[in-house]
Regions:
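Positively charged, amphipathic and often flexible ligand-engagement surfaces
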Residues: 2-416
Length: 416
């Protein structure tokens, strides 16, 4: 394992009138990793190293998909590696220990039933019932501030693609689309009745128009008193900053609150590959700098309109997190949340939570075999973000070095 190196970050804050807390960086590792043994830290380091290799990642993902197709017993391997790192458990009951441990550090939990790509009415109904259970769980537990769902858990991908393309639906498809809208309405109505905000995840650009339609319809109905329904905006798309501003204008004109989760995006390679294959301009910004610029501009826009917007900054980017933290006049602003994925960005989550900011971890769960598509996507996304994964490795190295130094100092004191 390479020698650990010190990392620091210093960025100018967003403009603000006054500040009660000024964060300089996210270099502190002790609190972020204190619940991990030295052995576990080394296991995590090797996992991130494998994920940081595009070749190994590609081969591993292909092998895992092949094993699933052949119905090979891969669950034990997945459970001991990717699942252990990025999931809270297989059931709600198994997630309780994770929820409690995070709550001890003032970090909330967003339970994410991470089953993707359902294709049957029975499967869609099961996902709907699970999301409703998560809303009930959140109502009963203050450590769970949001519920969340993916529309592809409630509807066929092909149907969402056709609706998004504004194609004429057959009578059967029209009935199917009505069913999808009814499922979303059941979830969002339950969320409003329970006073539990619910986030709708963003997905591929060619089905996103249908998701946006469902989200905005639900906001008009349920966000009259406060933001209950949150749509997710992926700022790696060229058009999303303008879309955010258009949504705000609509909310302002129609008298409802806009709820948004701001993310950079999770389907970059897939989006670019499809655009190249079908011969249309990629909807994704050509550079990371362009994405960062739009992401930070989106945060700045939301901060300027907190009387009408509630938002969650879903980011592992230290610069964006520092800027937002240092821009807030009070850490625990009721309309602002930070969020990172479970198993990643702990140095950001724990530092923010220790200073009183609203922080929540996205905690995926579900049966191991059913969440493998999510885990593969997470591994592939991390491989595309090699700089970030390298940062996770270096933080683990820094914590191991810190422990070794502390152990040596303690030993020397004992000898003296």
């Amino acid at each position: 394992m390479p020698e650990a190196t010190a990392i620091s970050s210093s960025v100018p804050p967003y403009p603000t009138k006054g500040q009660s807390i000024r964060l300089k960086n996210f270099d502190e590792t002790e609190s972020a990793f204190k619940h991990h043994s030295n052995r576990r830290l080394r296991q995590m380091w090797w996992l991130f190293r494998l994920m940081n290799s595009p070749t190994l990642n590609r081969w591993g993902s292909a092998a895992l998909r092949l094993a699933m197709r052949w119905h090979l017993p891969v669950e034990p391997i997945v459970k001991a590696t990717l699942f252990r790192q990025f999931c809270g458990g297989q059931t709600l009951e198994e997630c309780q220990a994770t929820i409690a441990r995070l709550a001890q550090a003032n970090i909330k939990t967003i339970l994410d039933y991470a089953v993707e790509g359902e294709s049957t009415e029975e499967g869609f109904e099961q996902v709907t019932q699970t999301v409703l259970q998560n809303i009930a769980q959140a109502k009963a537990n203050p450590a769970i501030p949001f519920a969340v769902f993916k529309v592809t858990g409630l509807a066929r991908f092909e149907l969402l693609e056709k609706v998004s393309a504004r194609k004429v639906l057959t009578s059967e498809e029209e009935a199917e689309w009505q069913q999808v809208q009814a499922r979303v309405a059941r979830i969002t109505t339950a969320a409003e009745q329970a006073a539990v905000p619910v986030m709708i995840d963003a997905e591929e650009s060619w089905i996103q128009a249908a998701i946006d339609e469902l989200a905005m319809k639900a906001m008009r109905q349920h966000n009259r008193q406060r933001a209950i329904v949150f749509n997710t905006i992926q700022l790696y798309r060229r058009d999303r900053l303008a879309y955010l501003k258009a949504c705000y204008a609509e909310a302002e004109a129609e008298g409802f609150y806009l709820g948004v989760k701001l993310v950079r995006g999770a389907y970059m390679e897939k989006e670019r590959a499809r655009a190249a294959k079908l011969g249309y301009p990629s909807p994704i910004h050509p550079t990371k700098a362009d994405t960062d610029k739009d992401y930070n501009a989106a945060i700045e826009f939301c901060l300027a309109h907190l009387d009408r917007i509630a938002f969650c900054a879903g980011t592992h980017n230290e610069e964006s997190s520092l800027k937002l933290a240092n821009a807030l006049e009070t850490p625990a602003h009721p309309n602002v949340y930070f969020s990172q994925l479970y198993g990643m960005g702990d140095h950001i989550s724990y530092t923010l939570a220790a200073h009183g900011f609203n922080v929540a971890k996205y905690v995926p769960y579900g049966a191991v075999r059913k969440v493998i598509p999510y885990l593969l996507r997470r591994a592939e996304e991390n491989s595309a973000l090699s700089g970030y994964v390298s940062r996770e490795q270096r933080l683990i190295e820094a914590e191991i070095a810190r422990r070794q130094k502390a152990k040596k100092c303690k030993k020397n004191l004992h000898v003296d």
